[in-house]
Every structure is written in structure tokens, then in C-alpha cells.
């Protein structure tokens, strides 16, 4: 399995390297969502446009890593009992366990203007500050309380820790720390920005979704059997507060809307939820 991952990543990396001299061009025959996803490194062909956007994924994602009931069960013990314990570490690791294919997992993708940072390390710090501020603004706009957990040890991805936030919102069933936000930012790389990325510059510090393990993500999880938190609204609010050059991709069954998981993929850009819908039908 490790060898297969390495081979697949090498093939994808080679494809990306071939495009390094010029940024990816916009494909008028694809939706904006698909153009942004492809630019962000989601190249596998399980993801594609469909006439109405609800049949844009080729495979069933009813697997353990993305099964919301399974994920919720793993978080049943409230965080107030887990802080600093191996169980919290297990829960954080569980959130990280997603499929190899980029289209099958939630991902953050970004093209931070190179003028905003002096180095890749500086760019990482800037990304973290942007995401933290977006979570804070989104929480305030929805009148919920989100607290960043700084006293817990979490797994690292690409040399950087997984960030955890505890959410309190009694009207949505978030009490006793049973709701969390988890995100991570991989080490940004120098890249070229596609012209259709809003607010971008020609050169950027990029976080992409193509690596089998070292990719960025932001997910909300609510434990228990009743998924009452408006995750779709929260993701939209976070996206609206993020810089315009960051987009959020979610695979089927990972976004909760009206208490039910959406069975199709979506991408959030500037607060808008984009579907993978053929341009002729948009």
C-alpha cells in the first residue's frame, strides 16, 4: 500500500511539475468548482461535473473513514474527559484518517500572494492566522462559542500540528465539548497562481490537495447520533471570512445540511457553496 501511494503521488507530482512553468488554464467546459479543484491538486477522475451537480462522484463513500456515524461514535466521550489523554490523541488521529484519493476527502487549498510572506515558514504562520481569524469571525456571526485548545498534544502533518477548537452552542446540541473543529495547514510551497483565483498574484505560497498524506483540511465534527449543528452554514461562514484565495473542498457525505449529509461533493469559495455542475446546466 505504501509503495502504491508513493507511485501515485510520484505520477501526480510529475504532472504538476509539467505545469509549473505556466499556471493551469481555465477550462470553459468545466464548472468553476471543478476548475478550482483541479488547480488545487484534485486530479483523480472520480470527481467530475454532472448535469445537476448531485451525481459528480463516481464511487460510493460509505466507507469507515468518511462514515459520519463512525466518526461521531469515536468522539462520543466529551473532550472535557479527554484533554491531555491518549483518547483525545486517538480522536485527533481518527479525524486525520481519510482516503488516499484527493477527491474522497475534505481539503483546504490556497494560493497566498507571495508578497504577504518572506518565506515558506512565514507563509505557514500567515495561513494559520487567516484560518484562526475566519473561525473566530464565523463563530461570532453564528452566535456560537469556539475556543482554540492550546493545552493538548495532537498529531503532526508535514511537521505541523493538527489544530483543535472546542465549540459550545446549546441550541445546536453542542455542550460538554462534544463538538470540535479540527484543521491543519501543510508546509506551503512556492507556486504559480491561476488567473481565475480571486485576489491572487502571479506567484504564491500554495497549499494543495494532491499529496496522499501531507494536505490541509478543516472539518467540523459533532459526536452523538443527532447531527443538529448546521455544518453547511458554518462552512459557508468560515469561507466568507477566509481570504479570497483560499477554497474549501468537501467530498460526499462530509457536509451536514438540515441534519442530513449531502451525498455529493461541494466547494466553498468566498462564502458561496459551489456544485460540480456542467456549465451548460449552471
Predicted regions and their residues:
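Sec-dependent bacterial lipoprotein signal peptides
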Residues: 1-21
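Generic hydrophobic secondary-structure signal
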Residues: 7-8, 16, 27, 74, ...
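Mature extracytoplasmic/lumenal regions of exported proteins
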Residues: 38-77, 87, 91-282
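Compositionally biased, intrinsically disordered low-complexity regions enriched for acidic
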Residues: 82-86
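Short non-domain terminal segments
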Residues: 5-7, 24, 39-41, 45
